[in-house]
């Protein structure tokens, strides 16, 4: 029996798909994450934008091209939003985003397998994504995810530590829909970080919200043996007026102060971010504030995308900007982001850094430094090992590097 588990969307979706794959492998099945011939397809969908939702709906037809008689099981945010659309396509089973274990129950029941629930995800040799929470209570005016993922739910610290202890990966990434709000009973994200102080693994964080950046939080991170100082601090707009309309709960000035605080504790930190181009209320003046904050903060990387109105959100009721304006602003943001990324990497040329080797391809071993600079070393190096390197020049989306210690 062969199964394909195909995923669209965020890192949380990827972690959940990895759990589904690990469970199906326990059934003794051959499992792949690439669309190809299979007896069973599990399609994990996304609805963060209209384009993502469209691609999700098209997945059923794409799967059937490989095997018209395959059994198709659908889960994720797009099927949570519109379950009927998938049921009408004649798939075997549809669940949503909130309990993906139902997929396993449905498959186990149909094929006579033991329903043991979702397994811990099978990890790569280098990086383990550890899901610490799900859901979001923020209800930003443009975002559909809280309506689909539901209210925030966090895992016990003991369960998280147990999963980390079982992985052989040298790096773990704490992951979730809104990890800044992590809290099981009386524990907080700070408490979880402190509980990791004795781990020898490199600890990296998923996307963060502005409110979590405090001296207490940064001090806890300083206490880790091996912290990767990359802070993905979601911005969305550089304009305080637009942030208000987005229901983001901070101003431009407050965001900049949080970034300054990060640099006080971690001078070499990579601060990366998301910015929406062309939100419904965004004027040209507002947009210029988004453009200028890229240089002011010194972002190491900018993920920019055009505003996509999502039915069911507050912002959906607002008058949308013309597509050409959104497109033009997006291109300007992307260009500014490329300049900022290159400027950040140049700071580290001819300086010693470490990186964990991830893969060897076309004559290069690649991987990432703690501050998330992609490294290209023109040698074969064993994956999963940490090496000392010196960056020599900018190359593609990172930098060439020479090996200085094995």
PLM region spans:
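Residue-level signal for inorganic ion chemistry
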Residues: 42, 77, 103, 174, ...
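Short, solvent-exposed loop/turn segments at secondary-structure boundaries
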Residues: 52-54, 151-156, 183-187, 245-248, ...
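Conserved SAM/AdoMet-binding glycine-rich loop
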Residues: 72, 81, 168-284, 295
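Glycine-centered loop/turn positions within well-structured domains
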Residues: 101, 138, 150, 180, ...
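Short flexible coil/turn linkers enriched for glycine and charged/polar residues
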Residues: 123-125, 136-138, 227, 237, ...
């Amino acid at each position: 029996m062969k199964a394909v588990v195909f995923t669209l969307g965020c890192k949380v979706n990827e972690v959940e798909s990895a759990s589904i794959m690990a469970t199906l492998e326990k059934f003794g099945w051959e499992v792949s994450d690439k669309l190809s011939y299979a007896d069973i397809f599990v399609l994990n969908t996304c609805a963060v934008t209209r384009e993502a939702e469209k691609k999700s709906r098209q997945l059923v037809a794409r799967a059937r091209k490989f095997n018209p008689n395959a059994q198709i099981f659908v889960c994720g945010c797009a099927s949570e939003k519109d379950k009927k659309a998938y049921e009408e396509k004649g798939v075997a089973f549809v669940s949503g985003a909130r309990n993906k274990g139902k997929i396993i129950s449905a498959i186990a029941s149909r094929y006579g397998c033991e329903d043991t629930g979702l397994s811990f995800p099978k990890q790569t040799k280098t990086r383990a994504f550890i899901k610490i929470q799900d859901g979001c209570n923020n209800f930003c005016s443009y975002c559909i995810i809280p309506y689909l993922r539901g209210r925030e739910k966090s895992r016990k610290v003991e369960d998280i530590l147990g999963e980390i202890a079982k992985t052989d990966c040298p790096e773990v990434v704490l992951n979730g829909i809104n990890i800044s709000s992590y809290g099981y009973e009386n524990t907080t994200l700070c408490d979880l970080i402190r509980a990791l102080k004795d781990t020898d693994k490199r600890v990296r964080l998923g996307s963060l919200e502005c409110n979590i950046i405090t001296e207490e939080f940064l001090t806890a991170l300083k206490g880790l043996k091996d912290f990767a100082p990359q802070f993905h601090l979601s911005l969305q707009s550089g304009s305080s007026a637009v942030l208000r309309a987005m229901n983001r709960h901070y101003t431009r000035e407050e965001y900049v102060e949080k970034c300054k605080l990060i640099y006080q504790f971690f001078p070499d930190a990579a601060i990366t971010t998301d910015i929406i181009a062309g939100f419904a209320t965004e004027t040209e003046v507002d947009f210029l504030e988004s453009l200028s904050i890229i240089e002011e903060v010194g972002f190491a990387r900018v993920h920019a995308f055009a505003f996509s109105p999502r039915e069911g959100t507050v912002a959906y009721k607002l008058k949308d900007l013309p597509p050409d304006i959104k497109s033009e602003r997006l291109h300007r943001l992307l260009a500014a982001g490329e300049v900022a990324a290159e400027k950040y990497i140049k700071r580290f040329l001819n300086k010693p850094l470490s990186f964990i080797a991830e893969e060897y391809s076309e004559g290069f071993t690649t991987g990432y430094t703690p501050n998330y600079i992609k490294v290209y070393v023109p040698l074969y190096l064993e994956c999963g090992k940490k090496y000392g390197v010196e960056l020599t020049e900018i190359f593609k989306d990172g930098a060439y590097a020479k090996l200085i210690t094995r």
